[in-house]
Amino acid sequence: MNNISPIDGRYKENVSELEGYFSEQALMRYRILVEVEYLLSLVELKSFQKKRSLSKKTLSSLRNLYIEFSDKDFKQIKKIESKTNHDVNAVVVFISEKLEKISRKDLIPLVHFGLTSEDINNTAYSLMTKGATKNIMVPAIKNVLKELKKLARRTKSLPMLSLTHGQPATTTTLGKELAVFISRIERELVLINEINLLAKFSGATGSYAAHKAAFPKANWSVFAKKFIKRLGLEQSPITSQIEPGDSIAELLHSYVRINNIFSDFSLDMWLYISRNIFVQKNVSGEVGSSTMPHKINPIFFENAEGNLDVANNNFSFLASRITKSRLQRDLSGSTVFRNLGVGFAHSLLSYKNLIKGVLRVSPNKKQLKKELDENWSVLAEAIQTILRKSGDVHAYDKIKKLTRGKPITKKLYLQIVNDLKASKEDKDMLLQLTPHTYLGEIDKILENL
């Protein structure tokens, strides 16, 4: 009721699955995950094994700190933070207190050993982003594609007047135009799957200085690489205090492209509905306008378009900002990173609205036929191309004089063809051609749809 952001208010139910990745509580949980797994990896090193060993019970207790992380745990950390005024330090204190409760005070010195807060934060953010992408965002995008493919398959053989520059152009099919967006999104999904998110775990200024001072014989760079790999990330080998953020920026740019494609799709669907190419379902009880009772507005495509714009503004800003920091580090990037989930939420909301929009439309075959019947001029391209094939160097200009800016009816088209100086074979082909059949190799193009 009193939320400032519509994501946490009006749209909360639509994006709640992202809370496990981008809420502050989720961030705390991922920080604990990184701290705990780092502690467990340290204990495996020979330098530490002589002094400490872990039972299965201890292992389970430690991992349960993030597996079973609760509202109560989160509130406890926030209470600690209210005193320390440092969120990562509050996590360290929380873990230390838990170790004391299970009688493993000997492990407390290893919590956050040799690390800076950024080691924990950058790794946590990469894990959050990777998890949200794999488990929420990509499946949501695929769900849009699933419904869009169904619609494209149903309409792939429905001839439609295409418009270039808003003017009648070569015949296409409704399904083929939808398939354009499917093809573009499928390509982006391949690319997004190839992006490896990076993390650094090399201390205050990226040199393992504290680690090396404590245990000079250990190969800390190799240790960090193995640890980061174990978490499912790639090592960023040469850094300052911060991980530069280039890999997350790369991922966000992928989302920008995906969202631009979906925005383009939303705009086209809006225009097709406006042209009466698609008609929308009349859902009983719904209201389209507060003053015009007759209206059924394309609200789902409009909502998607608006939220895609919000998402992309967020993604573009983040992708630019998170890759910059003063010298070895400043804190301005920290508050920026806290907004990482905003673009994901607005994107997810858009994807769900696109599905709703697609499910509510059906093709208007009468309108499709009407537009083609009224635009025989689109066959002018075929006529001039046939004449060119026959060697007529003035073919284009001849047909231009006969058709440009003129209403071409079926009768006039047939007259133009009959008056051509062309072979009987070519004339017969053109006489059989109609705006409904001028489809080129669309069947072949769509055979794998």
Where are these regions (language model features)?
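A structural signal for small-residue-enriched, beta-sheet-centric alpha/beta enzyme cores
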Residues: S117, K212-F215, R230, Q235-I242, ...
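Hydrophobic stripe of amphipathic alpha-helices that form coiled-coil interfaces
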Residues: L151, T155-L158, I192-I195, A199, ...
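A helix-coil-helix interface module used to build multimeric assemblies
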Residues: M1-Y208, F215-A224, G288, I299-F301, ...
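Conserved catalytic cysteine-centered active-site region
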Residues: K98-R104, A224, I228-G245
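Glycine-rich cofactor/substrate-binding loops
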Residues: M1-Y30, V34, K57, I80-N85, ...
